[in-house]
Regions:
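Intrinsically disordered, low-complexity segments enriched in small/polar residues
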Residues: 21, 70-72, 99, 166, ...
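Active-site-proximal, Lys/Arg-enriched surface segment
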Residues: 29-121
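Short, charged/polar micro-motifs that form catalytic or ligand-binding hotspots
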Residues: 2, 13, 76-80, 141, ...
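Electropositive nucleic-acid engagement tracts
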Residues: 1-65, 71, 157, 180, ...
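Phosphate-ester processing/binding pockets and catalytic centers
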Residues: 3-5, 9-15, 21, 29-32, ...
Length: 207
């Protein structure tokens, strides 16, 4: 359906016999989009062609002050982190036709940013006692769950809907981290991507 103006519940009701409240009630219910997209993938894909899975993120500009999930994400177009929304997209790509079919899209939740530890004020050595002297804990500021964990969980939730012939997962260098790499191995997939600059390959991964 093609509509003029913004795509919201109010505008959709103008092009339909349903009211705005009906659209809002329906959107409150959960819907299995990966299963829905899987049905059409089975009709669109050629069983004789080679297919691979691809995962990547997309930045969405958002100026609202109370938007859920709004945080600072990397914007590839601007080449820097900006405030907005981010979605994680998993697609199935047909090699021969070079067509990409979106299978699952998930919004990246906002996570607390890692803040540098505050420096303690300098005091004379005589004012410090052994009982009160404490070293700043650098690990306390690190979040337990990171965005890499969100991407890995998104992959785990979508793996069931992959075509049976999918063997390879393609992603850029950002995903080449231990948490995401371990999730790929658990799902019996082969990872294709560019190594990070600080990556240290070991032979134990291939044994």
């Amino acid at each position: 359906m093609l509509v003029y103006g913004k795509v919201n519940f109010t505008n959709l009701s103008r092009y339909s016999c349903l009211s705005e409240k009906t659209y809002r009630r329906h959107f409150l219910k959960s819907f299995n989009f990966p299963q829905f997209n899987q049905y059409f993938l089975e009709k669109a894909l050629n069983p004789e062609h080679t297919v691979i899975a691809v995962i990547d993120c997309s930045f969405l500009t958002k100026s609202g002050k109370k938007t859920d999930g709004k945080a600072y994400f990397y914007n590839g177009v601007a080449g820097k982190s900006e405030e907005g929304l981010e979605i994680s997209v998993i697609s199935i790509v047909e090699i021969e036709t070079r067509l990409s079919y979106s299978l699952s899209v998930q919004q990246t939740p906002s996570r607390p940013q890692i803040k540098p530890a505050k420096k303690l004020p300098q005091k004379p050595k005589n004012c410090w006692s052994r009982k009160t002297r404490k070293k700043p804990d650098s690990q306390s500021s690190k979040p337990d769950i990171t965005r890499v964990d969100d991407y890995a969980q998104h992959l785990k939730n979508t793996r069931y809907f992959f075509p049976s012939s999918v063997r390879y997962l393609v992603a850029d260098g950002y995903y080449y981290r231990s948490k995401f790499w371990e999730a790929v191995r658990e799902l019996n997939l082969d990872f294709i991507g560019k190594l990070r600059v600080d990556a240290v390959p070991t032979l134990s991964l291939y044994r």
